Amino acid sequence: EVLEGLLDPPKYFPDNVMLNKEGYDESDEIINRSFNSLTAEEVNNMLKEKVTILDVRSVEDFSLSHIPGSIFIGLDGRFAPWVGEILEDVSKKLILVAPEGREKEAIIRLSRVGFDNVIGYLEGGISSWIKNGGKISKVLNESASEFSTADNNKHILDVRSKNEHKS
């Protein structure tokens, strides 16, 4: 009864419990090793390794152009809970695509929930990626009226949590 209505803990939570028990790196140390600007060519070469591109820009910017296979979790909003839900593995190596001037903020906010394996960020953002011939993907955004008048062979997938659905 006491726990009724509470959300399940995020998937990264057990890892954070271990971090709290065993200790973790100082914030300055994490920032120093993570705050690395990477050229588009360097990022492209790293895609062959097991790295995850985390795009933390606005949903509008991500929709217009993003690196194929990148994961979108915008800095504005419920960043930490979504990071924990989507990324799960705190040991993942991350490369950031961030709004200019907010790279350090993203690194700090990731480290607060145990994700401190940021390799660096894409220098010059997505425009440098495009300028250097990098492939991009786009997301089609439609209004409800556009969706309802378009092809009837579409399905809606509700991905809200139980608590979100109730409200």
Task: List PLM regions with ranges.
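Active-site neighborhoods of enzymes that stabilize oxyanions during catalysis
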Residues: I130-H155, R160-H165
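Accessory terminal helices/loops
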Residues: E1-I53, R57-K93, P99, E103-K104, ...
